[in-house]
Design a protein with these regions (language model features):
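Short, Lys/Arg-rich, polar N-terminal cytosolic tail immediately upstream
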Residues: 1-5
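Alpha-helical transmembrane segments of multi-pass integral membrane proteins
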Residues: 114-156
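Membrane-interface interhelical connector segments
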Residues: 33-64
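Cytoplasmic juxtamembrane regions at transmembrane-helix boundaries
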Residues: 81-110
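Individual transmembrane alpha-helix segments
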Residues: 58-79
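N-terminal signal-anchor transmembrane alpha helix
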Residues: 6-38
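Hydrophobic alpha-helical transmembrane segments of polytopic
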Residues: 10-16, 72, 109-119
Length: 156
């Protein structure tokens, strides 16, 4: 397979992840209540048994819940922007002769992909899924969606 085809595929895929991150962040701002409700229920652990072994982990302060949601949105926007800028850098600066030029242009792309991966793996699967026991939260369990996002980013 020609190296230009592989490079073009990398640019397109990183750009797609970037658009996804920015679009997700913007959607969470425009339709704030929908996903804030998920964050609220996961952090407050109100869908779990009230006297469960992990009930002490619950965060019920609405200010802290809003702060957590703002951090999620900011991370989505940041990884998205980094990936878009990274894709543009790969498309432009990465077109020089040889592998070194393309490799030298990967920094923003790698940073954006790593941040997106960390959001869904650490933020949703580890913190949300395990610490706050989201896997037990019925309709508020967003682990499947997070895993899909994690898998897509991980493949890129």
């Amino acid at each position: 397979m020609p190296i230009e085809a592989v490079r073009t595929a990398k640019v397109v895929l990183v750009g797609c992840v970037g658009v996804f991150g920015v679009l997700t962040g913007i959607d969470n701002i425009l339709d704030y209540r929908t996903n804030f409700e998920v964050v609220h229920h996961v952090l407050s652990m109100d869908a779990l048994a009230p006297n469960g072994a992990f009930a002490w982990r619950a965060i019920t302060d609405p200010r802290l819940q809003r702060l957590a949601y703002a951090a999620i949105i900011a991370t989505e926007l940041l990884y998205g922007i980094l990936c878009i800028l990274g894709a543009l850098r790969l498309a432009g600066g990465g077109r020089g002769p040889g592998v070194r030029s393309f490799d030298a242009a990967k920094g923003l792309s790698v940073a954006g992909l790593a941040l997106g991966f960390a959001l869904y793996f650490f933020g949703f699967l580890i913190v949300g899924g395990e610490w706050f026991q989201m896997w037990q939260a019925g309709q508020w369990n967003m682990q499947e969606a997070a895993f899909r996002f994690l898998g897509a980013i991980g493949l890129v």
